[in-house]
Amino acid sequence: MKALALLSGGFDSPVAIYLMKNKLEIDALHFSLEPFTNDIPEKKSIELCKKLGIKNLYVINHSREHEEIVNKCDHRYYYVISRRLMYKVAEELAKKLNCDYLLDGCNIGQVSSQTLSNLSVITQAINIPILR
């Protein structure tokens, strides 16, 4: 079984990878927001993959889409719309890589996109199971 892990460079996603790496083959995906942010999250993701033994890290620049969402969407829904888009992109890559799951280090209730109702809306955008 294989999973594509969404790796932000934060705390929760590497914990999810660590917990599942002995059960699944895992590739990782990082969404870069350069030039809106610096390259620190990308560098952290590269370093985390090395430490966790993840051989394949895919980096997708998401800055153009991020800018569109910020400029055109109701800001109350920013996180939900952004996550839905990232999940759709991740699902497409997961299909190409023959992954069975997406792996997300979601910490339920931590931020607005991670409430149960918002997670439900986000998850409806894709057809691949998500391990959280």
Region spans (language model):
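Structural beta-sheet core signal
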Residues: 5, 28-30, 59, 104, ...
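Short, ordered loop/turn segments at secondary-structure junctions
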Residues: 31-34, 62-63, 106-108
